Regions:
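Helix-capping and short linker residues that terminate individual alpha-solenoid repeat units
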Residues: 52, 83, 99-104, 129, ...
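CBM-like carbohydrate-recognition segments
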Residues: 25-69, 78-90, 94-97, 101, ...
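Acidic-glycine-rich active-site phosphate/pyrophosphate-binding loop
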Residues: 40-48, 91-93, 135-150, 195-204, ...
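Asp-box/WD-like beta-propeller blade repeats and closely related beta-sheet repeat scaffolds
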Residues: 133-169
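Bacterial Sec-dependent N-terminal signal peptides
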Residues: 1-25
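Acidic interhelical loop/turn segments
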Residues: 153-154, 267-269
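Extended ligand-binding clefts on enzyme/binding-domain cores
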Residues: 161-162, 172-267, 273-284, 296-330, ...
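Aromatic-lined, polymer-binding surfaces characteristic
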Residues: 64-68, 72-75, 107-125, 159-171, ...
């Protein structure tokens, strides 16, 4: 081996060793009270103790809502990754009444926001192998594609950016539970189609095609959905390259809009809009996942992810409720509408991605 070859070999070894160590440094040595293990446990326990929610309204819900589904899913993955059997037991106990007196709360899977419920029983099956959970979740995943379009998409497709998480996670979970690649192929096709149709030249996504605003949480669902998909999509899958390209393009754009405090804003490219925590947690989750899997440059994105997490911690109440969560928002082609949206504390739109972040740090 000549001197030049030896130098290149040593350099390659150094890069292979140093890069993981760099991200380990950024994702450890947390200030007191801010570690993902501590925060994740607090939020998961708080969720177990919280009755079923209804989008911030005082009356009880008529069905399990999608923010609760997203939080339940995050709590389950955190409990598994932290090997916290007590948390897992509490999360399973929360589900028990849905097989009995609360069966009426199971959503009818005729719409994206309802069908996403399937992600929870499918995750429980993945962890427990209890057949009743697979039967429930798989039936919903199959119904979502009972009448596909000529292009092979679900008839629940509506080209709202939220769907890039809501719709895709059901098919991903069905794939993770069964190993049947038809579910993976469905979700990947759906995501690639949405990317092709909706991603803007700057890498971000309008809230709707006729509403040209980059609303934080809407884009957050997209970022989280792509991160989830890429974790399961094989390297040779035909949809992986376009999804990876869309993901990396979005992450590059987001990096320039992160505030000095680590937090993104209600409208991503409007720094005068308020700091918004649900979108920040979703973007942070996507970046943690990208760094951990080697999809993103660690030197650029590991510090951004750390800064995002620590910024979020400053909005946490002692009981685990996070502040500055934008209320559920329908589209409207009016800037002031987004600037004036109410900020909630403890809304599950914010609790959920905090748990996703805690899980991502532990993976």
């Amino acid at each position: 081996m000549n001197r030049t070859t030896k130098l290149f070999t040593l350099l390659a070894i150094w890069i292979a060793v140093a890069a993981p160590l760099y991200s380990q440094k950024e994702f450890s040595n947390w200030p007191a009270g801010s570690s993902p293990q501590q925060i994740g446990k607090k939020l998961a326990q708080h969720f177990i103790e919280t009755p079923h929610t209804n989008f911030g309204r005082p009356e009880p819900p008529t069905q399990i809502t999608y923010p609760e589904v997203a939080t339940w899913y995050g709590a389950l993955t955190f409990a598994k990754l932290s090997n916290d059997k007590e948390l897992t037991a509490g999360l399973l106990k929360r589900f028990d009444p849905l097989f009995g007196p609360e069966a009426n709360l199971i959503p009818n899977p005729i719409h994206v926001d309802n069908t996403v419920f399937a992600a929870v029983p499918l995750e429980i099956y993945i962890q427990t192998k209890q057949q009743k959970f697979l039967d429930m979740g798989k039936a919903m995943a199959d119904k979502q594609w009972a009448n596909p379009t000529p292009d092979g998409l679900s008839d629940q497709t509506r080209f709202w950016i939220d769907d890039m998480f809501m719709l895709v996670i059901v098919q991903l979970q069905a794939y993770r539970a069964t190993g049947d690649t038809k579910y993976l192929d469905r979700g990947a096709l759906e995501m690639a189609t949405y990317l092709d149709k909706l991603q803007q030249p700057n890498g971000l996504f309008y809230h709707a095609p006729d509403v040209p605003f980059f609303w934080g949480r809407g884009d957050g669902w997209v970022a989280a959905g792509m991160a989830e998909m890429l974790q399961s999509l094989p390297k040779k899958h035909p949809q992986r390259a376009p999804i990876m390209a869309g993901y990396q393009k979005m992450m590059k754009s987001l990096l320039q809009y992160q505030g000095s405090d680590g937090v993104w804003h209600q409208l991503i490219d409007h720094p005068e809009s308020y700091p918004e925590t649900s979108s920040t947690a979703m973007f942070t989750f996507a970046m943690i996942t990208g760094v951990k899997n080697g999809w993103l440059d660690k030197k650029s994105y590991a510090p951004a992810a750390r800064k995002g997490w620590l910024g979020l911690i400053t909005y946490l109440e002692p009981n685990g409720d996070i502040r500055n969560v934008c209320r559920g928002t329908a589209k409207k082609n009016e800037l002031q509408y987004y600037l004036d949206r109410e900020r909630l504390t403890g809304d599950l739109h914010g609790q959920a991605p905090m748990l996703w972040c805690a899980s991502a740090f532990l993976r």
